[in-house]
Amino acid sequence: MGNYSTKIDEKWQKKWEENSLYKFNNKNLDKKLYVLEMFSYPSGSKLHAGHWFNYGPVDSWARFKRMQGYNVFQPMGFDAFGLPAENYAIKTGIHPKDSTFKNIETMETQLKAMGAMFNWENEVITCSPDYYKWTQWLFLKLYEKGLAYKKKAPVNWCPSCNTVLANEQVLDGKCERCDSNVDKKNLEQWFLKITDYADELLEKLDELDWPEKTKAMQKHWIGKSVGAEVTFNVADSDLSFNVFTTRVDTLFGVTYVVLAPENDLVDKLTTPENKAEVESYKTQAKNQSDIERQSITREKTGVFSGSYAINPINGKKVPIWIGDYVLNTYGTGCVMAVPAHDERDFAFATKYNLPIERVIEGGDSLPYTEYGGMVNSGEFDGLLGNEAKEAVISKLESMNLGRKKINYRLRDWLVSRQRYWGAPIPIIYCEKCGTVEVPIEQLPVELPYNVEFSPDGKSPLGKCDDFINTTCPKCGGPAKREADTLDTFVCSSWYYLRYPDNNNEKDAFNPELINKMLPVDKYVGGPEHACMHLLYARFITKALRDMGYLNFDEPFLSLTHQGLILGPDGLKMSKSKGNTISPDDYIKEFGADVFRMYLMFGFDYTEGGAWSDDAIKSIGKFVDRVERILENAREEIKNSKDNKSTMDKDEKELNYVRHHSIKSITEDIDKMQFNTSIARLMEFTNALSKYLGIDAIKNALFLRESIIDFITLLAPFAPHFAEEQWKLIGINSSIFNEKWPEFDPKALIKDEVEIAVQVNGKIRAKINISTSSSEDEIKESALNNEDIKNSIGDKEIKKVIVIKNRLVNIVAK
């Protein structure tokens, strides 16, 4: 074992803190670099290996950038509201505030033991009143701009968590947190109008340096569709309904229409003889989640309402069906069915023996879903694609039965939660004045401590008289506070704006400072947030820009998703499986730098992989070996009597590896390819060891320059160990104030190269030649090689082909 241990970690962490080494200078923003990892949720009592995989390597990247001359801002905080702490409190009796702050204290200690450059003076904790005061301010600003509103709506309800879930929090019909089946309820809820920004959220995506998969997920979630809205009248009635379609050119092929079970028209147009069956079907549909109902693999079901609609383009009667695959929250809650040209409609029509009529030519069989000439479509026969669509829409417009329309899959953001542990919504209800905003000067509306929060389906704050009963700020009369709390994603939708100005008591942030500090230059976190946090943060940034607070469009310019660290068994880590990895145990045994380097060398950063104890031991041995080599190098420099100043063959060989390492590591670490960066360091280590092992006079000055570069390259990956080695070579300033080395292109031009020599296409030898050798000299060296002579034997040499500095091929027969 070498001398490196947690004692060295603690020594340098103390020095860094005493010297305020990493304190951010917000007065010098010319080369600022805002580096941000998604903050952690303090639901568990400790950080696990997955947290480390997010934070450790990114800190190494930030250190590298600091050494390149950037003024790095790397804050840290905690996303501290939410269900897990409340559920833990219900289970254990420990108040969410108490457990959350205890966990935060533990995690802060762990994060500091990592030795990262976190700017702790800029810490934010979302459950602190001095933070959620400004979350409430944000809500009020959105309300003032008409971007926050309340309405009764069908919502996803988790009967176990006893709260509303956003669509994004329902996975395959189950709650993402507790795996319970999700129900539907009609409740008065608060929403944010993210749909107002649907177009811009799409348009700006391609400009971002984000993973293509994440951008594709957001595009799909927003789901822009350009088409037409068509009006169908109900036969023998004054009722009508609209449908949205992207294929209005298939309108002549409509043979039935389908309404969502929740559609208000269902009760009005269902005939008495069909009522019982329809009611039964509605009950069945109510127990399905939106995502489950939209599943591609699920068989589509429906019931006939007994009524008919009139196809506006040809006047034909078509049956009106009720089907749960139609969502009342998407489009108009009604769809037209063209079974000849839609796979879903074809399957439904086949199942229920409904007519199938071709109106687009092409394909040998049905359904045919591509574009083609219109057929069986009267005056429109022969028209294609956009021309066909335009003609049909024009006809519908002339009849006042249709128009062009753009539709979105994206729904407004539901932010009400019927739970305790969240930011109270700053709204008051007065019988005289109606809905009233809490005045800014009365913020924060503080979350009371003594509340009965056992879940019963109602908002816990509604049962707290001291909280719920208040005075109307307008008329001074008795009033009630809003009992719901805000979705935790509201808290995290703007936290990146608070970090640089976290002690501001007058405003959420100083726009002058924030507009210089942001956008975030590098954001790192898991891909699971693609359609929630990342989308919400983009929306909030744009909304605040339009209010005049921000002068930029996007919060995060560059985004990287780290991979997933699995248990030793290759499965996702969980306490129930007993395969979790505690960083603390390994740090105690190996030190923080070995743990950090293992995470960066053992896994591709964006892929992750399974944990291996053997692999971390190998990294520990590597650090010990580096320590021995650097000690030998110091001794060589110190005791060198017959020093030389020339750069001979051995020096040139080491110098080549040195500058190749500088070039490769600089390129790879910049792209967060940490594993290949450390592989280059290992090659550099081998080259140093080889040079130290030669029995010849050495160039001590060159050796010192080489180990200075080596330690500098090592520093981002093993910060404590590198600081210690830096001091041992006699330099008193921090290595993190050192300039990152630059490679010398001349050092990468070799005097000699190794080339392969083939006989009849098979490699028979390798020879070293001067890079300045002529073609004749290369031929001569190849033909004089003993292995080549033996391979040729008595054969006659017919041809010698030379590819300079790469290959010699001898043809002999």
Swiss-Prot record:
Its EC number is 6.1.1.4. It is found in: Cytoplasm. Keywords: Aminoacyl-tRNA synthetase, ATP-binding, Cytoplasm, Ligase, Nucleotide-binding, Protein biosynthesis. HAMAP family: Leu_tRNA_synth_B. Belongs to the class-I aminoacyl-tRNA synthetase family. GO terms for molecular function: aminoacyl-tRNA deacylase activity; ATP binding; leucine-tRNA ligase activity. A motif ('HIGH' region) lies at residues 40-51. Signal peptide: none annotated. InterPro entries: aa-tRNA-synth_Ia, Leu-tRNA-ligase, Leu_tRNA-synth_edit, M/V/L/I-tRNA-synth_anticd-bd, Methionyl/Leucyl_tRNA_Synth, Rossmann-like_a/b/a_fold, tRNAsynth_Ia_anticodon-bd, Val/Leu/Ile-tRNA-synth_edit. ATP binds at residue 575. Its main location: cytoplasm. PANTHER family: LEUCINE--TRNA LIGASE, MITOCHONDRIAL, LEUCYL-TRNA SYNTHETASE. It comes from Clostridium botulinum (strain Hall / ATCC 3502 / NCTC 13319 / Type A). CDD domains: Anticodon_Ia_Leu_BEm, LeuRS_core. It comes from the Bacteria. GO terms for biological process: leucyl-tRNA aminoacylation. One of its GO terms (cellular component) is cytosol. This is Leucine--tRNA ligase. It catalyses: tRNA(Leu) + L-leucine + ATP = L-leucyl-tRNA(Leu) + AMP + diphosphate. The keyword Ligase applies. A motif ('KMSKS' region) lies at residues 572-576.
